[in-house]
């Protein structure tokens, strides 16, 4: 198998427990290497048998991250893009399901010449072939591959075997393994315990892989003594034991790893020389704004269907961090369960207590829809900054149709196929689609903005490109009526057929979009819609505080005023 020359491979694995942050580690290392002038790409390998996460429940998988080319991928790709400010693609996320599907398709076409198809060599060879796809055009120096799951999981074994074989083929100076483990702190003993890390490395060794570098997550910093102990029992040099203790924000991780010299250890082992010193001043400034905002805090409510699991809204939450830093405030998120508002006895005004803005989040299905519509109505009627995304835009138009356009049972045909007023309907090209996976309107599409609109003011240009993931769209039969009643269709597809952005006149800030702007917000490039929304919420909060102060300030009598003078 021909492989591109001079491309260095870094594989990131995890042990002891899940959710240690392999994605953040991979993205942080990528940022450090990029800051030294290296061309870096990152990919994620997931061991589940699904072809992609597009049909998986948000409760199990979290957010589905959509790339420009329309791939439905793991949320870790969002971290890669936000940290490196580089687009990802379908090639950056491989699942075991895609591997097996490809192997079976080849068998059906007779490409194995009648042989018995087995995990070794056929599945392993398929994985190794995919491992080099991103490096084939010679446009990168380093390829970082994050392997999902935890060492010891049976599902990950084919990926690990492929990595083992690849290291033999490429040589130890062209491939290294970084193993992320957990060093728990036992409060009763006031000690950090290394035994779980030792056992995790032992399990990795059973697959034939000796880790080159250990990154140890812990509640408290690792002492030199602890690092020496880990290195001694795990057959790793103590300089290759990297401490990564808990921090206030994930955006501090690159700075912590820089201090621990992870990038230097990686470059030395891979024979990478003569690269510039990293300049992360902008990153340090961003972290300072996140940790110590000049103008305090504001609270924004996220009304959604999956509020018990914040990872379902990962990119939205991260976008609020970016926009908060841009506006010198810390954005606190209050999760608002849409289903709660479907109860007529629910006091919606109490839910808005302390909230300076409302975002109605994406989702699918009719559960909680009437609650979302009710939240939209309250924000519109009380002039509270409002931002709707995807389903949030659809709920905004349903609410407007019912309460402003006098279409009492207006709805989406997704929720009520017999509604008299289908203001949201299935897109024409979707009506013959039967399969669920990978069949929505996915990926980046152009949008034309209306001159003088809020959207045009925020973007500062007429043509934008945004990422989509939907089947339903605004029904143009109702466009004229909506415009007459005060709704502005400020963004459409280039041919004008598809509504992408709606706004309201005479409202402090009311913008709803069919696309997913949260997927394109970056540390250095906060998304203009989130930036504008947080700015409006900040002004709203400051206005409420000023009003509160005026109400609380005692009124002086004329005599008292004269005496004061």
Curated annotation (Swiss-Prot):
SUPFAM superfamilies: Class I glutamine amidotransferase-like, P-loop containing nucleoside triphosphate hydrolases. GO terms for cellular component: cytosol. GO terms for biological process: 'de novo' CTP biosynthetic process; pyrimidine nucleobase biosynthetic process. UTP binds at residues 18, 193-198, 229. L-glutamine binds at residues 59, 363, 391-394, 414, 471. Its EC number is 6.3.4.2. Catalyzes the ATP-dependent amination of UTP to CTP with either L-glutamine or ammonia as the source of nitrogen. Regulates intracellular CTP levels through interactions with the four ribonucleotide triphosphates. Belongs to the CTP synthase family. Homotetramer. This is CTP synthase. It comes from Chlorobaculum tepidum (strain ATCC 49652 / DSM 12025 / NBRC 103806 / TLS). The gene is pyrG.
